[in-house]
């Protein structure tokens, strides 16, 4: 992962040490960093076993409710699994939706208590999609995040997911959102990553043969380079927590599009900090990453 703060939060969560989680999160001021670190603390197996102790100990604080609500989203996905809806049994869906309601209840209270906070609304964007509340409701929640932090990274990522065909959107809506964000975002913003993310989602939906033709097209390749130049390759770009995910997504998209020289540049930045997403789309995360890194480095003579 390469992030000592994230590692500390995960270790504390696994140990049920909510005091350490509270102390660490209380020092994080940037809204994107804060949401990222809440995610790291909450998306750990077993949070539901200790978080109520924290809620009871600090009933006036919204932070334990935020962690409980975010943790309940992870808990719900544990019941559902990561496959498409057609692979999920009816009993698993019942547990999934029941746990999502717990998350919604907690996060609704968070957004009522902390009127200026973006994180509660950001996690409610996830819930809009997971609870199948529809694009309009998820977008309403997304706009609540934007009122508080216009370029919130996780909120944009989850809004993009809502616009994917598998969640009720379309390729057209998904790409439009990614490209409009790219056009409007500040120079060097990590949100340029929405463009490769959208193309990888589109690639995943296509049958063999069509997928390679699509992602290797001149139009897609041009958009990938434009997105990289406006974000991770821009002089204003600054690495912040979760930066490996951005570079891994560009690396995979460049690999799939046949632009191995550009991919090698991303692998140089990544080092060994492989992230599960998006490489798991193509099989074993580490094996696929290492294979394509080797191919990219062979092209540049390493």
Q: How would you describe each model-predicted region?
A:
Residues 207-249, 255-256, 261-262:
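Intrinsically disordered, low-complexity segments enriched in Gly and acidic/Ser/Thr residues
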């Amino acid at each position: 992962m390469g992030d000592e703060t994230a590692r500390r939060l995960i270790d504390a969560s696994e140990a049920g040490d909510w005091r350490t989680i509270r102390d660490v999160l209380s020092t994080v001021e940037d809204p994107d960093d804060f949401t990222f670190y809440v995610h790291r603390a909450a998306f750990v197996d077993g949070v539901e076993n200790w978080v109520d102790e924290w809620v009871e100990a600090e009933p006036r604080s919204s932070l334990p409710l935020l962690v409980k609500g975010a943790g309940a989203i992870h808990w719900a996905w544990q019941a559902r699994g990561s496959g498409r809806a057609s692979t999920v049994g009816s009993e698993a869906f019942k547990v999934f939706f029941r746990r999502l309601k717990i998350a919604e209840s907690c996060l609704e209270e968070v957004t009522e208590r902390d009127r200026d906070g973006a994180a509660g609304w950001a996690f409610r964007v996830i819930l809009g999609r997971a609870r199948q509340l529809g694009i309009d409701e998820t977008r309403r929640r997304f706009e609540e995040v934007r009122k508080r932090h216009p370029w919130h990274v996780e909120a944009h990522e989850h809004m993009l997911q809502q616009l994917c065909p598998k969640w009720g959107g379309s390729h057209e809506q998904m790409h439009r959102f990614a490209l409009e964000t790219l056009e409007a975002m500040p120079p060097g913003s990590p949100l340029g990553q929405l463009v490769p993310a959208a193309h990888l989602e589109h690639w995943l939906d296509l049958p063999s043969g069509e997928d390679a033709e699509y992602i290797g097209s001149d139009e897609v390749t041009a958009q990938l380079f434009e997105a990289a130049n406006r974000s991770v390759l821009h002089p204003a770009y600054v690495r912040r927590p979760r930066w490996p995910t951005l570079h891994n997504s560009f690396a995979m998209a460049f690999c799939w599009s046949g632009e191995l020289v550009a991919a090698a540049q991303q692998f140089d930045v990544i080092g060994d900090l492989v992230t599960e997403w998006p490489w798991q789309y193509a099989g074993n995360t580490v094996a696929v990453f290492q294979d394509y890194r080797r191919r990219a480095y062979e092209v540049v003579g390493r």
